């Protein structure tokens, strides 16, 4: 195995870093019933807190992407972790919906600064033939973070709900881990003329030199990927209880079943991308989840549908890790943290719109039809990938 001597420390540092991305998003969802009562807000107002986080992440992908390229990717990750920890801890000192809205936007900025630098660091330190599995392992911490959030919620939510957020301040000492494990970046210029190292990367860099089409299509792939994920993952539990008759008691453990499948799916499709190529692996993941969700539409056996959640989870996140390697290879080295983070986080538009859209379709035509739409979304995503170039064709001997 080639790559740099820092490849393993970087792997673990980025794995831990990305865990806080999913932890933050999950604790907001877990605490939402309490927030509705404490802040005396409506369901739409509660939903706006999630939307503010998504908007912040989109802005953060630009801000932290430029920081990563001009001041260093390690520095960007450290700053994002400290920023995130401050945002999580500040929850203890606010008590109005307006303050929450502003805080969630600001915290979202930090969230948007994590994905791109993580993907770029893996690309820098891991060779192409192992890069898919390395990136997928890093981003599989999404599933771990969600499980940790669920466990912390069970422990503290009935005691002091703010502790659920305050626990996220662990991201601040985690920044020290990044400083310890990730090597300093090569010299990056902060001057416009490029006399002190590399030229400054500007906000339009991902649209210059013929990159506009690539950036646009890659962003669309992220929109489809995240729309499919949140459309399916958000509504499948409700579908199984309302239209397939699974009890709430049975569904209590369903999220853990899905997260187990997600973690395994990350690893499988990461290895597959190193074996047969990035695009083929992601297309396989999209087709897998489309077929798996379709099974929910036609099968009615409750116990089977419960455990089928492993297969659905397996496909849901299969492409997410591979995209980390793919986007880093798709763009030039000097902008890969910015470009990858931009394409991924702008895709959160799909995450924001899908739950409402699928819910509306479900209200009018039934959730069975709504889930069928997510299958179509994934098939469209598979077709869309064919419009982008392959970056690594795979090594079947690996």
Sequence positions of predicted segments:
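Cytoplasmic helix-loop-helix junction between adjacent transmembrane helices
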Residues: 103-140
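Helix-loop-helix hairpin linking two adjacent transmembrane segments in secondary transporters
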Residues: 138-180
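C-terminal membrane-cytosol helix-exit motif in multi-pass small-molecule transporters
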Residues: 170-188, 382-389
């Amino acid at each position: 195995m080639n790559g740099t001597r820092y490849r393993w420390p970087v792997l673990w540092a980025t794995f831990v870093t990305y865990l806080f991305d999913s932890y933050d998003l999950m604790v907001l969802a877990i605490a939402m019933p309490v927030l509705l009562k404490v802040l005396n807000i409506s369901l739409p107002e509660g939903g706006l807190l999630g939307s503010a986080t998504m908007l912040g992440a989109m802005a953060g992908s630009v801000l932290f992407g430029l920081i990563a390229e001009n001041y260093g990717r390690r520095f960007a990750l450290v700053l994002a972790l400290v920023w995130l920890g401050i945002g999580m801890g500040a929850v203890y000192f606010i008590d109005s919906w307006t303050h929450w809205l502003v805080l969630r936007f600001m915290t979202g900025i930090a969230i948007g600064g994590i994905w791109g630098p993580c993907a770029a660091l893996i690309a820098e330190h891991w060779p192409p033939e192992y890069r898919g599995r390395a990136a997928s392992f890093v981003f599989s911490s999404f599933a771990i973070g969600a499980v940790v959030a669920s466990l912390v919620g069970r422990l503290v939510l009935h005691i002091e709900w703010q502790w659920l957020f305050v626990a996220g301040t662990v991201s601040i000492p985690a920044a020290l881990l990044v400083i310890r494990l990730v090597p300093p970046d090569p010299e990056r210029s902060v001057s416009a003329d490029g006399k002190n190292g590399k030229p400054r990367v500007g906000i339009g860099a991902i649209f210059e030199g013929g990159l506009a089409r690539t950036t646009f299509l890659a962003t669309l792939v992220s929109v489809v990927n995240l729309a499919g994920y949140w459309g399916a993952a958000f509504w499948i539990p409700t579908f199984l209880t309302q239209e397939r008759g699974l009890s709430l008691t049975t569904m209590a453990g369903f999220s853990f079943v899905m997260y187990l499948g997600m973690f395994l799916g990350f690893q499988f499709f990461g290895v597959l991308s190193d074996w047969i190529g990035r695009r083929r692996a992601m297309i396989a993941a999209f087709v897998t989840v489309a077929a798996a969700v379709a099974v929910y539409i036609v099968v009615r056996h409750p116990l089977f549908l419960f455990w089928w959640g492993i297969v659905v989870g397996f496909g849901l996140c299969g492409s997410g890790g591979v995209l980390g390697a793919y986007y880093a290879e798709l763009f030039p080295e000097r902008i890969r943290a910015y470009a990858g983070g931009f394409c991924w986080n702008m895709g959160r538009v799909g995450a924001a719109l899908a739950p409402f859209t699928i819910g509306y379709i479900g209200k009018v035509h039934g959730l069975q039809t709504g889930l069928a739409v997510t299958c179509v979304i994934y098939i469209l995503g598979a077709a869309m990938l064919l419009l982008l170039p392959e970056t690594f064709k795979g090594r079947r001997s690996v």
